[in-house]
Amino acid sequence: MASKASVAIVGSGNISTDLLYKLQRSEWLEPRWMIGIDPESEGLKRARGFGLETSHEGVDWLLGQDEKPDLVFEATSAYVHKAAAPRYEEAGIRAIDLTPAAVGPAVVPPANLRAHLDAPNVNMITCGGQATIPIVYAVSRVVEVPYAEIVASVASVSAGPGTRANIDEFTKTTSKGVEVIGGAKRGKAIIILNPADPPMIMRDTIFCAIPEDADRAAIAASIHDVVSQVQQYVPGYRLLNEPQFDEPSVVNGGNHVVTTFVEVEGAGDFLPPYAGNLDIMTAAATKVGEEIAKELLSAKVS
């Protein structure tokens, strides 16, 4: 029995390269291939240095190999993954999608880590989604949340061409995740590319409308619990201060609101610590991939 599930990384940009470092440390996942389209990319160069087989000939090359991976992690762009996803499924390869394509069900570890382990394709939503949806989920499991709004602010230099090309998909996919996984009746997402120099760490603000008679202590306790869960795979995820409870006003649309401020400091594997927006995506994807790998490996034994 193989002790690890074999993995291919499709994409050789910032996210893929940071993911490579995390997969190298995994007890359940073995990165074997990295696929890109630029033969001179830093990602492919580093992957070769780790002993991975690499190609700049895209998904066609990977699917043309005799040996195929158990899992593929794709960090390209939404339209590229939408085209490749059915081909992975046809080849029997489980896909973890780090683009906003949302071909398969979305996963945020604290909320629904084990809900879709049998799905052929799972989606990691967006960096803003991974950072903020856990907080919405923490509130909605205590009280009804008729509306939630998240604002994700990331260092402009951490946003590569793929992120910039996917801005529209980012807002749509994150808003949907706030509703479907976070539990809000209606959700809205905003991303800000902060041009500050030196670059700012990722910071997120989460607004949740709550009932007038909401148990504030229970909401705060739930938020702290979920933050500790995220910290198990993203140690640099933290509350900036205690959740703030506000009375209805013109500013907040006449709602009782709880506002939560978080920041995400990256592990500094490939990218600087300020790029916590990329780190939380790759860390969450690794966490989900490990759970899928455990299921695959146990099935091979039985």
Curated annotation (Swiss-Prot):
UniProt xrefs under InterPro entries: Acetaldehyde_dehydrogenase, Acetylaldehyde_DH_C, NAD(P)-bd_dom_sf, Semialdehyde_DH_NAD-bd
UniProt-listed SMART domains: Semialdhyde_dh
Positions contributing to NAD(+) binding: S12, G13, N14, I15, S158, A159, G160, P161, G162, T163, R164, A165, N166, N277
GO BP terms, alphabetized: catabolic process
Catalytic activity: acetaldehyde + NAD(+) + CoA = acetyl-CoA + NADH + H(+)
MF annotations from Gene Ontology: acetaldehyde dehydrogenase (acetylating) activity; NAD binding
UniProt cross-references to SUPFAM superfamilies, sorted A to Z: Glyceraldehyde-3-phosphate dehydrogenase-like, C-terminal domain, NAD(P)-binding Rossmann-fold domains
Residue pairs linked by disulfide bridges in the UniProt entry: none
Keywords: Aromatic hydrocarbons catabolism, NAD, Oxidoreductase
UniProt xrefs under CDD domains: ALDH_C
One Pfam short name: AcetDehyd-dimer
Active site: C127
EC number(s) stated in the UniProt entry for this protein: 1.2.1.10
Family listed: Belongs to the acetaldehyde dehydrogenase family.
Protein name: Acetaldehyde dehydrogenase 1
